[in-house]
């Protein structure tokens, strides 16, 4: 229901806000504005270590086991059929939290072991993920051509233990071919 309302808002250019996303498109533009609706940095003890796990409502994770667990939020956007898109992200407001040890993602299996292992990303002195915003290939749902636009409003450097939190951003869908 929320996805359908977001689609209609995109198609009819009616201001609508869902999970922090708001359509701000003008003619010949495909823009979404993101405003962080809140999050919690929960402390969790695993393997005798204290980790921080960022949590947001209506968010999923788009990570593999061993990678830093960072929530990702998504929405659908109606697009012209037969076109493909990329996304351009402009961060409008962010903050950096220091001395944070983000919990590694354990597993996609339904049965958890309670043991987490830090993957190779924890050895790198760079922010993860490298791409904060993504757009899917177009899909057809109920006769509408749509793309899924996803944003990870967190970025983590495991070596410096810095967590960047995005409070607001603008995303523009850019036509990248047919």
Name each model-derived stretch.
Residues 3-178:
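Extracellular pro-sequences of secreted precursors
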């Amino acid at each position: 229901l929320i996805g359908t309302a977001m689609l209609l808002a995109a198609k009819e250019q009616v201001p609508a806000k869902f999970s922090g996303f708001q359509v701000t498109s003008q003619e010949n533009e495909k823009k979404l504005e993101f405003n962080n609706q809140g999050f919690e940095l929960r402390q969790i003890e695993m393997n005798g270590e204290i980790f921080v796990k960022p949590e947001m409502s209506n968010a999923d994770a788009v990570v593999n086991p061993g990678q830093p667990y960072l929530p990702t939020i998504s929405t659908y956007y109606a697009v012209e059929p037969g076109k493909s898109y990329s996304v351009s992200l402009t961060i409008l407001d962010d903050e950096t939290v220091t001395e944070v040890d983000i919990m590694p993602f354990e597993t996609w299996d339904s049965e958890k072991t309670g043991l987490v292992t830090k993957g190779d990303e924890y050895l790198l002195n760079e922010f993860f993920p490298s791409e904060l915003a993504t757009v899917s290939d177009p899909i057809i749902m109920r006769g509408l051509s749509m793309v899924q636009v996803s944003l990870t409003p967190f970025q983590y450097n495991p070596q410096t233990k810095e967590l960047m939190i995005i409070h607001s951003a603008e995303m523009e869908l850019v036509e990248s071919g047919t």
